[in-house]
Amino acid sequence: TLSLHDALPISKVPKGQGYLPAFWLMANDENVYGQWPRCGEIDCMEVMGQETNKAYGTIHYGNPHSESQGTYTIKDGADFSDDFHTFTCDWEPGKITWYVDGVKYHEESDWYSTTVGQGTLTYPAPFDQPFYIILNLAVGGSWVGNPNDETSFENNPYEIDYVRVYQKDSYNEDVKRPPKEVTLRDPDAKGNY
């Protein structure tokens, strides 16, 4: 059971249309806030098999379904199927941060949840409850499409060297929803906004 942590797998992904290797987290108990997406989901790493130079980090939450996503594109023509890479998801109260090979590429600190009959719940719900780790390789689906004639099923594994999970001794759990930044447009010639 995980609640507040820094999780670090090192993995090498398969290449080919229709593959979707992933490292993600789901709520231990969907009854706390309700079924997905109300219960929350943290995608620490997803890589599309036909686009193995890009990793996605995403949170899913709320009702109706909302998501916030960041992407990391590997440099110099390399891709995540060539070699092992570290994918880190640092989850603290009120903030989730994603890294690839130690490079920060995305941070989220604003979300919400809802439950049936209670309306919108206060931040940091739903990411204030225990989650569990899932490491899987999905094949096919609406996002990555189905495998095609060029997709190899032989000698094309999703390799995971290790998974490490750390938990800090203490956290600042008195988190507040970040204020929304308001941007005013420039006034027109008459001074109206």
Predicted segments, located by residue:
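GH16 jelly-roll
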Residues: 3-193
